[in-house]
Amino acid sequence: MASLRKTHPLIKIANDALVDLPAPSNISVWWNFGSLLGLCLITQILTGLFLAMHYTSDISTAFSSVAHICRDVNYGWLIRNIHANGASFFFICLYLHIARGLYYGSYLYKETWNIGVVLFLLVMMTAFVGYVLPWGQMSFWGATVITNLLSAVPYVGDMLVQWIWGGFSVDNATLTRFFAFHFLFPFIVAAVTILHLLFLHETGSNNPAGLNSDADKISFHPYFSYKDLLGFVVMLLGLTTLALFSPNLLGDPENFTPANPLVTPPHIKPEWYFLFAYAILRSIPNKLGGVLALLFSILVLMVVPVLHTSKQRGLTFRPATQFLFWTLVADMIILTWIGGMPVEHPYIIIGQIASILYFALFLILIPLAGWLENKALEWV
């Protein structure tokens, strides 16, 4: 008699994904981030749900309702701090997950990779509309500046901006719809995540060697279920430590001031996890050019599989491309730093050089290095 987990129509699906899934025996801790992202999403949905029970999406009460949550609601301060810092951990895991994919050539699973890029965009949109909700100064001005970028779209730009705003400026209609979007998007993210997994399980996981691992598989449970559990403990420990000891470390002090359309903050900048893209946007003096560069800074990930020139899958045995990969990591850190700096010398030129290098690495240098390594292998 086969066990219930192998016969029940619903439990069978979970079993094939979480229990009897054949996984490569050599996948390292870098393969933990997928499950960590799932944990982040669940944490954000749960804390967000409890916050939504007490939040009011009206410009006259939004800021006060957040203060009320932190002061008067049972453990409201904790729920809010976990939700706000959970977003940062979400993006840390996202960037590490993408970096793993780039390093080990996981992007060659094209459907899985492209759905992942769509997920990345969806999570970015969710985080952006969520940042507007507390209705502080940086919430308001961040929303104004970023939505205003759509006015760069030829012909329909201005109409598009007014359509998103629901008026002629960021106002009550904007806040209400952003709350609706912020509530909806995580569930769309959850649905697309299932698609992401569906396509991944068509091929099975990649591994650090970049070789076919069909001959050497082990079951997901207990080996990787416990390994994932360890990752959960480490991440939750980090998240609770940040949320309890320095919850405002990654936030902007401007957001402690209620939104005021008449006073512009000295430096308008998004949360730290968007700064690299913001730096690329600012480094182009033309509005439409900046918007296109911003968009392409994310969409460039979609062309990575097309530009794969190497005979080998990962970078494990490719020192030249390894060097360029770590150059890309350093470049991202520089862009993040520049995004938080004022627009003045020398930050402008550093940002422009870093932006050019960012695209050059993806589109020219890494594919070229792969081709050169192929040539070098022919001489061995």
Swiss-Prot record:
Record has Transmembrane as a keyword: yes
Cofactors (names): heme b
Subcellular compartments: Mitochondrion inner membrane
GO terms (BP aspect): mitochondrial electron transport, ubiquinol to cytochrome c
Free-text remark on how the cofactor is bound: Binds 2 heme b groups non-covalently.
Family per record: Belongs to the cytochrome b family.
Quaternary state and interactors: The cytochrome bc1 complex contains 3 respiratory subunits (MT-CYB, CYC1 and UQCRFS1), 2 core proteins (UQCRC1 and UQCRC2) and probably 6 low-molecular weight proteins.
Note: Heme 1 (or BL or b562) is low-potential and absorbs at about 562 nm, and heme 2 (or BH or b566) is high-potential and absorbs at about 566 nm.
Protein name: Cytochrome b
Gene this chain is encoded by: mt-cyb
